[in-house]
From Swiss-Prot:
A motif (LPXTG sorting signal) lies at residues 449-453. Keywords: Cell wall, Coiled coil, Peptidoglycan-anchor, Phagocytosis, Repeat, Secreted, Signal, Virulence. One of its GO terms (cellular component) is extracellular region. Residues 74-157, 255-298, 314-345, 400-455 are annotated as: Disordered. C repeats lie at residues 270-304, 312-346. The lineage of its organism: Bacteria, Bacillati, Bacillota, Bacilli, Lactobacillales. It comes from Streptococcus pyogenes. Sequence repeats lie at residues 69-75, 76-82, 83-89, 90-96, 97-103, 104-110, 111-117, 118-124, 125-131, 132-138, 157-181, 182-206, 207-231, 232-256, 257-269. It is found in: Secreted, Cell wall. This is M protein, serotype 6. Residues 1-42 form the signal peptide.
Length: 483
């Protein structure tokens, strides 16, 4: 019975996902599986295909362990995916905060620029006002100097006129005294005329009362003295009286004119003094305004320098912000690329997870099926175990022949899943070939994935892509810290 299983070779690589392990397990314990492209059907082979039940249990335990490992890897990938999603959310939030901060800095820079423009305009206006006040101050100073010079000239002219008048009066008096001795006859007429003239002058000129009274008194005393002393000078006195009258008239007229000129000069001088005081006050006010404007100018220049420094600082911060924004843009692009890779890895992980779930489901179903069949086959295995023990002695004799034919057995074409393997064809059935034929496929599966039978590839798996995405995110965070 055992010789009928010699040519039954099953290919694990051509089985679908999740069916390879079930097929191997069932073939080991005696339940043959014929695999179709869309469904899995179990076919019971003859009793001669039954093997050691301990090995069947070992294989079942092995696939349970592999299923647990795949489930653990699936949980690990899910956790890593959640961590990467949280990191992506944090980076997006931080990028939004930096964008808002950049907008605030831009608005503050615009406000400072407007304030700088306003201060510049105000500084220009203050400079124009300062220039106008300086020009006006120069004009007032020039007018004040001209007024002072004119007042000094008029005062000098008045002094010269008074000195000349005094000198002329002294000369006239001396001349009159010299001629008075000859004018005694005309003293009475001179006195009468002088009285009338003095009265008329007193009536007309209230301002010269004291001077005229003193002159009249002096003249009366002089006349009396002259009359008493010089009786012989009447003719000279008459002439002197006429000359004196003319001189007095001329003097009075000159004095009146001089008084008028002096009054006008005093008024003008008072006006000049008042103008000088006003000009001095204005000049002091202008000086204060000028000092205040200079102080304001200094303050404005200081504020302008501070604003310029702040503007330069804001520009520098803006450049740093622009550089940071560009770095954030690069980081965001890198994070998006990493996100795409993570999403791709997540899709692959989800697909593998679905495949693992499907495989797990198939394994659960196959476990249920094998448990049912195991109960049925257990009795058969116990009955046939005795027969196998009896055949071990015979198989030991044929073991040497089977080792020689092992090479030819390994070159036999693999049986397709949809075709039946007919026992008895090819090599002669021998009972001792079963253990050696099971070792070859097990060596092949060491280089294959346990679920699909495909050749294992350490690169571009879901875990590798997840590691690459994590490294990309770490690089983005490091670049951000450097910026």
């Amino acid at each position: 019975m055992a010789k009928n299983n010699t040519n039954r070779h099953y290919s694990l690589r051509k089985l679908k996902k999740g069916t390879a392990s079930v097929a191997v397990a069932l073939s080991v314990i005696g339940a043959g599986l014929v695999v179709n492209t869309n469904e899995v059907s179990a076919r019971v082979f003859p009793r001669g295909t039954v093997e050691n039940p301990d090995k069947a249990r070992e294989l079942l335990n092995k696939y349970d362990v592999e299923n647990s490992m795949l489930q653990a890897n699936n949980d690990k990938l899910t956790t890593e995916n959640n961590n990467l999603t949280d990191q992506n959310k944090n980076l997006t939030t931080e990028n939004k905060n930096l964008t808002d901060q950049n907008k605030n800095l831009t608005t503050e820079n615009k406000n400072l620029t407007d304030q700088n423009k306003n201060l510049t305009t105000e500084n220009k206006e203050l400079k124009a006002e300062e220039n106008r006040l300086t020009t006006e101050n120069k004009g007032l100073t020039k007018k004040l100097s001209e007024a002072e010079e004119e007042a000094a000239n008029k005062e000098r002219e008045n002094k010269e006129a008074i000195g000349t008048l005094k000198k002329t009066l002294d000369e006239t008096v001396k001349d009159k005294i010299a001629k008075e001795q000859e004018s005694k006859e005309t003293i009475g007429t001179l006195k009468k005329t002088l009285d009338e003239t003095v009265k008329d002058k007193i009536a007309k000129e209230q301002e010269s009362k004291e001077t005229i009274g003193t002159l009249k008194k002096t003249l009366d005393e002089t006349v009396k003295d002259k009359i008493a002393k010089e009786q012989e000078s009447k003719e000279t006195i008459g002439t002197l009286k006429k000359i004196l009258d003319e001189t007095v008239k001329d003097k009075i007229a000159r004095e009146q004119k001089s008084k008028q000129d002096i009054g006008a000069l005093k008024q003008e001088l008072a006006k000049k003094d008042e103008g000088n005081k006003v000009s001095e006050a204005s000049r002091k006010g202008l000086r204060r305004d000028l000092d205040a404007s200079r102080e304001a100018k200094k303050q404005v220049e200081k504020d302008l320098a501070n604003l310029t420094a702040e503007l330069d600082k804001v520009k520098e911060e803006k450049q740093i912000s622009d550089a940071s924004r560009q770095g954030l843009r690069r980081d965001l692009d890198a994070s998006r690329e990493a996100k795409k890779q993570v999403e791709k890895a997540l899709e692959e992980a989800n697909s593998k997870l679905a495949a693992l779930e499907k495989l797990n489901k198939e394994l659960e179903e196959s476990k249920k099926l094998t448990e049912k069949e195991k109960a049925e086959l257990q009795a058969k295995l116990e009955a046939e175990a005795k027969a196998l023990k009896e055949q071990l002695a015979k198989q030991a004799e044929e073991l040497a022949k089977l080792r020689a034919g092992k090479a030819s057995d390994s070159q036999t074409p693999d049986a397709k899943p949809g075709n039946k393997v007919v026992p008895g064809k090819g090599q002669a059935p021998q009972a001792g070939t079963k253990p050696n034929q099971n070792k070859a496929p097990m060596k092949e599966t060491k280089r294959q994935l346990p679920s699909t039978g495909e050749t294992a590839n350490p690169f571009f798996t879901a875990a590798a892509l997840t590691v690459m995405a994590t490294a990309g995110v770490a690089a983005v965070v490091k670049r951000k810290e450097e910026n």
